[in-house]
């Protein structure tokens, strides 16, 4: 149900191939069996899922990998409640919550409310164009 909400919301924002969610669901099921993945959801009193997230665990980190909000969840602060519940459930553990960063300033600001700090990642870009074109493109 959590992955279905993510899938529904992603349809509005991201261009993902139809099979991507099926592959992710299989990966999630495998990792869940190994206790390396979990989902969190926030429900209304009527039982409607209004916020959902998938967390993956590796190397003393919990990755906030997939998240979605129903429009009602945004107005009710459901994402705040979801992340807060995750933090409370894992308090005192040797675990760092990694929000996977964001180039969107409003998301970075939201994450900073939970104590998130910016982390720089090194990257290498290989230019495999033929020599004359390689020098033109810099």
Residue ranges and their predicted role:
Residues 1-74:
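A conserved beta-strand-loop-helix scaffold within acyl/acetyltransferase catalytic domains
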Residues 27-30, 85-89:
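A generic secondary-structure signal
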Residues 74-88:
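Conserved acetyl-CoA-binding loop-helix of GNAT-fold acetyltransferases
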